[in-house]
């Protein structure tokens, strides 16, 4: 019977992580469990930096961005002897299970702990919305709001100067955030990692828009596809239109979480405790069709893939 649990946040931070921690803590305490927060993710787990949390530890946290427990990259956690130390640190406190909030890299750490016999539950916390087994991740909707607001501001100045603007959006190798923001922001052109990119084709489309009387345009592109400063120079040379590139960067990860992220994080945190009390370990939580679901964390990492929203892209093209 589980009596004590740990909770940590790992990888890149996302708005709503604090709400998720709060959900875990409050639900666990309601069920009579003790909760330990781990500072700085797996690094803190290895370095034995933990603190017992009570209801007041998470007061006034639901509206705060970032993660008050901190997060850190710790690639050494892939080493078994490092994980063995982490498990021993938890066991000496009587911790029976661990809730991990983060992206697929964080899930990999939880998977490896599970394979060593220590039960973990993963919650999807990343603005990239690139975790399998869930329709949405904690932080995605807040980041979407931030990106759309930035696009709206860029449109104001692009319109004033009859300029082409390129805006680079986070997402790693998933275009969900870019695609949704582009539709909501009315972007004329969208470049995604799921679709082969050819800059000559993009310029041809921009020229076609200019020929139809288009005075300005916004190109939304997911990070890591190309150097957008070089792309801006190329577009300006080919179209003879002033072109500017904007990298939104880490501003997308910050800010107070929007209501949906607060609700999603709270539900997922409480559901993680429900699963642990039912004897589940090695699972990851998701939301599908607005219902809480859980999947085998190993299967989610190794076999499940997020479907590409091709119908969304086709819709966007009709609206150019």
Swiss-Prot record:
Pathway listed: Carbohydrate degradation; glycolysis; D-glyceraldehyde 3-phosphate and glycerone phosphate from D-glucose: step 3/4
Keyword Membrane in annotation: no
Main location (coarse class): cytoplasm
Catalytic activity: beta-D-fructose 6-phosphate + ATP = beta-D-fructose 1,6-bisphosphate + ADP + H(+)
Family label: Belongs to the phosphofructokinase type A (PFKA) family. ATP-dependent PFK group I subfamily. Prokaryotic clade 'B1' sub-subfamily.
Role, per record: Catalyzes the phosphorylation of D-fructose 6-phosphate to fructose 1,6-bisphosphate by ATP, the first committing step of glycolysis.
Record protein name field: ATP-dependent 6-phosphofructokinase
Phylogenetic placement of the source organism: Bacteria, Pseudomonadati, Pseudomonadota, Gammaproteobacteria, Enterobacterales
Gene assigned in the entry: pfkA
